[in-house]
């Protein structure tokens, strides 16, 4: 019996290894691989009409044009150091999260199984582009798969991460106003992309401008080696941002959400075309696409699950999107009701409605003020870093769009607290190459950094994060100092309680767990953990 089970496991492992092997596409003309970038110094590179630079704002800026494979190759060659560095950061964070080599190996094959048909769900155009970028990937991770297979799989990391962890560190917020709700009636869209894969992963943000051989020109906020889109706007004044919704564990691969978003940006000029593209693609997780269109002068949310699609149109002059569905078709499903009851999404939505109602006529500056808001419902102090806040102090990036004016503001570090710098898509795409290094932001439209950066609270939050990281790394901390650094945050007490419980200091742990219950807790799962720990201590 044991021998038969072992044989079954071996056959299963071989099957997964075989089905997860992904061969690169066959590209007719690969001459772009011979192209070389020109180094002009100070981090400024060019390759034909394409260019890459490091802005004084701290953001990287990239312009790429041409055929799919060429775009990928050029992207990879211009951003080569960032492609390698980003994979290093990603792999390093995975090692931190999963210290066991055996478990990481198992995860590799599990992801391989999920993504066994991934290439069959990606268009030839995007496979060619990803193949081009992958030629600049590091040779150090061949044990995880070929360069092409790895980079392709990374495009599904957002999907698998949010399905496996059920929104852990993927709690985004987006909203928009237009008509009577905006100061000059112009549409304004704001979004926080709260996707956290470690501090280093968020260091090298790229504001990328793409001029593809087919479709529309568009911009995205991205990172090295990633050709998909999570936040972007095209030259038709159509913007797209994505927010994760609750998903069940995927059983097979489909089109990564980021590539569906990119396809909408590249090929849709209005809401109906965006809906048609979203409907045509199979996805293996549930997602909300907030699509704003200058042509339609409104925004809607395309809500999509692996089985269904519905559209939420508020038929008002504003729209709010957190991490639950609102349409008639998908809003009443069992999974969505659970999401509303057990996650931070509904609370954050309620806070957003409060802020909009108190906002008056909206402006870009007011939009950014909302995106930076750390308070809870009724302006409650819920601590710094709470998932129930609009600003959770983990954002990879934050953006504001004015689709009719083709303007976009992008946050600078840290999170959404630094300056928001502005780009005019008309001006950027009119450059037709760049021979000398120069700033492309519109300095007259910069929104200043948040004054919170100058406060003792901010310094205490940095201290809190450092102590939290020390605990995660297995180090020692003073739990009184930990709690004092962020006393209104339930997680301060949970961290202290877990730390003390592990060291068998049960009375002190109990005190912290009980204090946590007096604070605003982000999710039902976390509250259940606290109550379970209290029960275990009392039963000792």
Q: How does the language model describe each region?
A:
Residues 220-223, 233-236, 285-288, 307-314, ...:
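A general structural signal for short secondary-structure boundary/capping elements
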């Amino acid at each position: 019996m044991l021998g038969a089970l072992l044989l079954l496991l071996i056959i299963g492992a071989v099957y997964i290894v075989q089905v997860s092997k992904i061969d690169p596409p066959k590209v007719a003309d690969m001459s772009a691989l011979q192209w070389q970038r020109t180094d002009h110094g100070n981090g400024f590179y060019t390759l034909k009409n394409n260019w890459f630079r490091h802005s004084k704002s701290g953001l990287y800026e990239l312009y790429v044009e041409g055929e799919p494979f060429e775009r990928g190759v050029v992207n990879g060659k211009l951003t080569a150091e960032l492609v390698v560095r980003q994979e290093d950061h990603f792999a390093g964070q995975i090692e931190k999260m999963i210290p066991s080599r055996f478990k990481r190996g198992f995860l590799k094959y599990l992801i391989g199984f999920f993504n066994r048909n991934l290439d069959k769900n990606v268009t030839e155009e995007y496979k060619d582009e990803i193949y081009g970028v992958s030629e600049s990937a590091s040779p150090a991770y061949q044990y995880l798969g070929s360069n092409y297979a790895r980079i392709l799989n990374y495009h599904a990391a957002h999907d698998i991460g949010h399905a496996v962890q059920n929104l852990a560190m993927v709690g985004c917020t987006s909203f928009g106003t237009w008509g009577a709700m905006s100061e000059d009636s112009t549409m304004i869209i704001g979004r926080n992309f709260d996707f956290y894969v470690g501090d280093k992963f968020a260091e090298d943000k790229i504001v990328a401008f793409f001029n593809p051989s087919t479709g529309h020109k568009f911009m995205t906020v991205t990172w090295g080696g990633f050709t998909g889109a999570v936040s972007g706007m095209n030259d038709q004044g159509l913007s797209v941002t994505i927010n994760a919704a609750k998903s069940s564990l995927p059983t097979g691969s489909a089109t990564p959400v980021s590539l569906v978003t990119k396809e909408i940006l590249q090929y849709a000029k209005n809401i109906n075309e965006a809906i048609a593209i979203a409907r045509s693609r199979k996805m293996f997780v549930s997602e909300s696409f907030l699509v704003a269109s200058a042509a339609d002068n409104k925004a809607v949310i395309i809500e999509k699950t692996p089985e269904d699609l519905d559209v939420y149109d508020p038929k008002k002059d504003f729209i709010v999107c957190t991490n639950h569905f609102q349409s008639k078709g998908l809003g009443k499903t069992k999974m969505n009701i659970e999401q509303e009851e057990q996650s931070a999404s509904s609370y954050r939505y309620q806070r957003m409605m409060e802020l909009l109602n108190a906002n008056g006529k909206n402006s870009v500056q007011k939009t950014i003020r909302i995106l930076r808001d750390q308070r809870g419902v009724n302006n409650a102090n819920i601590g710094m870093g709470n998932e129930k806040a609009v600003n959770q102090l983990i954002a990879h990036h934050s953006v504001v769009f004015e689709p009719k004016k083709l303007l976009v503001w992008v946050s600078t570090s840290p999170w959404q607290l630094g300056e928001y710098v502005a780009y005019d898509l008309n001006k950027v795409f009119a450059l037709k190459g760049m021979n000398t290094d120069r700033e492309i932001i519109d300095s007259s439209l910069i929104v200043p950094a948040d004054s919170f950066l100058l406060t003792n609270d901010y310094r205490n939050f940095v201290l809190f994060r450092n102590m939290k990281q020390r605990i995660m790394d297995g180090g020692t901390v003073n739990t009184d100092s930990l709690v004092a650094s962020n006393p209104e945050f339930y997680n301060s007490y949970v961290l202290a309680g877990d730390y003390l419980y592990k060291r068998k200091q049960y009375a002190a742990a109990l005190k912290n767990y009980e204090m946590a219950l007096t604070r605003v807790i982000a999710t039902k799962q976390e509250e259940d953990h606290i109550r379970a720990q209290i029960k275990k201590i009392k039963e000792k």
